[in-house]
A protein has these predicted regions:
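Select transmembrane alpha-helical segments in multipass membrane proteins
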Residues: 9-20, 45, 82-96, 131-135, ...
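Hydrophobic, membrane-embedded alpha-helices of multi-pass small-molecule transporters
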Residues: 15-25, 94-98, 171-180, 188-257, ...
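A generic transmembrane alpha-helix motif of multi-pass inner-membrane proteins
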Residues: 177, 186, 382-467
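Hydrophobic transmembrane alpha-helices that form the core helical bundles
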Residues: 35, 85-121, 300-316
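Extracellular/periplasmic helix-exit of transmembrane alpha-helices
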Residues: 245-275
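Transmembrane alpha-helical segments of multi-pass small-molecule transport proteins
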Residues: 15, 20, 24, 91, ...
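Membrane-interface loop-to-helix entry segments
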Residues: 144-174, 240, 350-362, 381-391
């Protein structure tokens, strides 16, 4: 079967690229760039360069790495070892699915969209208002996610253009009507702008999300006629490039918006929520509050839809005795329950969880890309690099949980940082692992064929199977 031409390949990848952009652009992506723009002052360029590197390029690389395995995160994790191949995907899917991210995005939509509109209409915040919001939001997300084979069409064709139009309106009017403000860079934005931008990019959670969305992307491309491994990788790169370009443009627009919006910014400010609210209300008045709410709802809804479908696809793959729709319903029920606890309760687990999982995920992606260049299949490199990153990442997680003893001990070396201290040791471990693989012959010896397994059918069934 012949593969599509270059022009048709772009046309095939466009809807999937729009879908991927919409899935990535969640609440976290919306609230951080304005803060970076306002807090960076004259350090705007290095701060945004760091943010785009980790918030755009790294998720793109992760999606491509997932496509090279042909098995999603399950296939990548199994290269480290069978136990890791079971535990790591489950932990990632739980964190980005029912136990954290879906509930978080639901409550963020309430805090930034539903609640301000209700207050505009004279209603006050209450548990009942949160319950109604969560019920409607989860109901709509569940309804869309029930048909993952049409996910690209529904998300890419309708929600993404609406989201982009609303963002263009808010950013355009604010930039044109508001004069630029002279602000000095504050706190870490002044002392270490590039690293601060890199760290802020981590907070989007898009690297973890990319390990999940990769399955949805590959399934969408397969349904559109790209079947060979080479065509799938090429289609993934094209789709990811489209999503990355849109993300970069939106991030820069929101960051510029932050430079032109009045608001009190200190080193302790955590997000750009107030900046966005001020921009909407000051430039568009009452209607601006409604437009801002619509942007947040669309951003959160598209993310929730993708996370629900991806979790159900993974769970159906792991436990095929339970149908896709039942897995989806179970995820929605758990997320519904947690979301009604409120945003503050949910965010308490965010820091330690991210610091623990991010080093594992980034190290796994890095070795996978090196492995793609090797004639054979790396073995020691996976174990050395991922294990080192995970151990040191656990130190950061413990610190985020409130115990800084191990971190202080490592800080005496003068080489440790809670946010990025694991990177250099992991790279050194990767080098050691590659040397060991070269000496053992694994670098140049093709991996033996593996017997068919449920994991090897992950891509085919994860997001497309329904019973």
């Amino acid at each position: 079967m012949s593969q599509p031409s270059s022009r048709s390949a772009v046309g095939t990848s466009l809807p999937t690229g729009l879908m991927l952009f919409a899935l990535f652009f969640g609440a976290g992506n919306l609230i951080f760039p304005p803060l970076l723009g306002a807090a960076s002052g004259r350090s705007f360029i290095p701060v945004m360069a760091g943010f785009i590197a980790t918030g755009v390029l790294m998720p793109l690389i992760t999606v491509v790495a997932v496509s090279t395995s042909g098995e999603g995160i399950l296939g990548l994790a199994r290269r480290v070892g069978p136990r890791f191949g079971t535990v790591m995907p489950l932990a990632v899917y739980l964190a980005i699915g029912p136990l954290y991210a879906i509930a978080r995005v639901t409550t963020v939509a309430y805090e930034l969209a539903t609640r301000p509109v209700l207050e505009l209409w004279g209603f006050h915040d209450s548990r009942l208002a949160l319950l109604v919001h969560v019920t409607v939001f989860m109901g709509v997300s569940f309804s869309i996610a029930r048909s993952p084979s049409r996910l690209a069409d529904r998300v890419g064709r309708w929600l993404t253009p609406a989201l982009l139009a609303l963002l263009a309106l808010l950013c355009g009017v604010t930039i044109l009507m508001s004069p630029g403000m002279e602000r000095e860079a504050i706190g870490p934005y002044a002392s270490d702008p590039l690293t601060t931008g890199l760290t802020q990019g981590y907070l989007t959670m898009d690297v973890l999300a990319a390990t999940v969305f990769g399955i949805v992307v590959i399934t969408s491309l397969r349904e559109r006629g790209l079947t060979s491994p080479r065509a799938l990788v090429r289609g993934t790169i094209l789709s990811g490039g489209i999503a990355a370009a849109l993300l970069g443009l939106v991030y820069i627009g929101l960051a510029v918006l932050g430079t032109r919006t009045r608001g009190q910014i200190t080193a302790d400010t955590k997000d750009g929520t107030e900046l966005l609210r001020n921009a909407a209300s000051s430039t568009l008045g009452t209607s601006g509050v409604v437009i801002f709410a619509a942007i947040v709802i669309l951003a959160c809804l598209t993310t929730a839809v993708g996370l629900l479908a991806s979790w159900a696809g993974y769970a159906y793959t792991a436990w095929p005795a339970v149908s896709f729709n039942r897995q989806l319903a179970a995820c929605a029920i758990v997320s519904f329950t947690l979301a009604n606890l409120g945003l503050s309760a949910i965010l308490k687990i965010a820091g330690p969880l991210l610091f623990l999982l991010y080093p594992f995920a980034i190290a796994l992606v890095a070795v996978t890309l090196v492995d793609a260049l090797a004639p054979g299949r790396l073995r020691a490199a996976y174990r050395w690099c991922v294990t080192t990153a995970g151990i040191l990442g656990s130190v950061s997680a413990i610190t985020a949980a409130g115990w800084d003893g191990p971190s202080k001990l490592l800080a005496r070396t003068g080489l440790w940082s809670d946010s990025t201290g694991w990177i250099l040791p992991a790279l050194l471990a990767l080098g050691i692992g590659i040397v060991l693989d070269v000496r053992s012959g694994a670098w140049s010896t093709p991996a033996p064929g593996e017997p068919p397994s449920q994991v090897q059918h992950d891509v085919e069934h994860a997001a497309a199977s329904q019973l």
